[in-house]
Amino acid sequence: MTDVPAVRIRNFCIIAHIDHGKSTLADRLLQATGTVDERQMKEQFLDNMDLERERGITIKLQAARMNYQAKDGQQYVLNLIDTPGHVDFSYEVSRSLAACEGALLVVDASQGVEAQTLANVYLALEHNLEIIPVLNKIDLPGAEPDRVVGEIEEIIGLDCSGAILASAKEGIGINEILEAVVERVPPPPNTVDQRLRALIFDSYYDIYRGVIVYFRVMDGTVKKGDRVYLMASEKEYEIDELGVLSPTQKPVNELHAGEVGYFGAAIKAVADARVGDTITLCNAKATEALPGYTEANPMVFCGMFPIDADQFEDLREALEKLRLNDAALQYEPETSSAMGFGFRCGFLGLLHMEIVQERLEREYDLDLIITAPSVVYKVITTKGEELYIDNPSHLPAPNDRERIEEPYVKVEMITPETYVGTLMELSQNRRGIFKDMKYLTQGRTTLTYEIPLAEVVTDFFDQMKSRSRGYASMEYHLIGYRENPLVKLDIMINGDPVDSLAMIVHRDKAYGMGRSMAEKLKELIPRHQFKVPIQASIGSKVIASEHIPALRKDVLAKCYGGDISRKKKLLQKQAKGKKRMKSVGTVDVPQEAFMAVLRLDQS
């Protein structure tokens, strides 16, 4: 099965914005080449996580090997590597691009180029991939292929004379796409006789076989039974299972340069088989590793605590298993006076955080409390030390810090010009600095802003979508740290600070934020037998306060008329009890209160 010469192998991926039809196109290619028969076919075949199907997005990378008889009569092997399209998952995209020589750029013929498509195209150009433009959904009544071709040529600078018009849903243009892949995507270089170097582009954990690694052989040959060495983690393993993904796993005995496959080697932890690592042979090690791998740095942090303290170990185990599949997830144990034991987790963005939370709850049956997301702040102390703080409760006291710097991102939005005003207003409300505005083609504009990441991670994306009725798209990347007058906003309930509700905010926004948090918590915290004060403070200065009135039992219900002193005695006894209760009683803060903090409308 693997005796195909490198000249007849094509490795390609599909780049597209969310909802431009990438997974459907992948389904059609699998059907057209007979890789999956009609009986097994289901929508979004390569999206094999329930969550992916439900949300209609691709999260984990998939790969599929297709055999294709081209018009020139030759038999070709096409390796399709599926890529996610959401802004949070750009690290997964860069790994899959490194394993390819070509890319299909899928653009919705009715919507045109979107911001995320642009970001991925630039990544593909950095990897020197041959890009084939495909205009999808041309069967829609609103499709305007000529306008979109103009957009691609103008915005990306690609020659679209060979653009393919297709409709994955109707199966139009599928054969043209396959032919274009054969003709235009360059074959992998024939480096079979060099020392083995292979790139890991994905891995997942199988409870029976350990970690299964997806890889692309760059140079040399790998055989079943070989002892391999992973260059970054410096571990050795023996390959006990080797195969290709077609798209289900089929064992083979060896794979040559240019081929894509998987192997199992009883690897216990995914941390030992890091994505982007280079595989080589123990007895003939490559001199240098493959270039281009960078550690994925989390941008957003939050605390995760099990509602039931007994589930702490289960949560640790679940996070370890998710980390297996998700190189970008980071976590470390933390304790909170309000919530007990839990973990501080780092994510690439908000969608990534939601997905991890949902997978923990769905796949591992955990009930979690998630604290408000925060970003990594840089604190310069009075002694001149640089500290990186991802948890507001670790912030040094005001007297010990010289200044606080926060991360800024460059946000590029592509939007119909009708919504430019409202998006500019949103960006300015989020402390954005206007940088640039370009008119692309008729009716579409790009806006460029520099905005603090803390303002983007809460609900900027949702706000942008709702203000533009879903038409605008955005892409962001980190541009560095800048100093701002930031303060730590503490929330005190019944006189005790709740560390999980603390946040770092801009001084100008602190009052409004404190007021709305106090009001929100007043609605959400259930009434207790005693009066509960809620205060928002900066340092020792209280800037907003509310209180929840006590529930009181009518102790006079059984007194009919009679002497006032009897009633007074009962009321004083009740007051004394309330006083004692207030000093020892604890206030339960429900999960909704933490979620409400996430959704505080800042716009």
UniProtKB/Swiss-Prot annotation:
Its main location: membrane. GO terms for biological process: positive regulation of translation; translation. It is a peripheral membrane protein. It is found in: Cell inner membrane. It holds the Pfam family LepA_C. Residues 7-189 form the tr-type G domain. It catalyses: GTP + H2O = GDP + phosphate + H(+). One of its GO terms (molecular function) is GTPase activity. SMART domains: EFG_C (SM00838). Its EC number is 3.6.5.n1. This is Elongation factor 4. It comes from Nostoc sp. (strain PCC 7120 / SAG 25.82 / UTEX 2576). The lineage of its organism: Bacteria, Bacillati, Cyanobacteriota, Cyanophyceae, Nostocales. The gene is lepA.
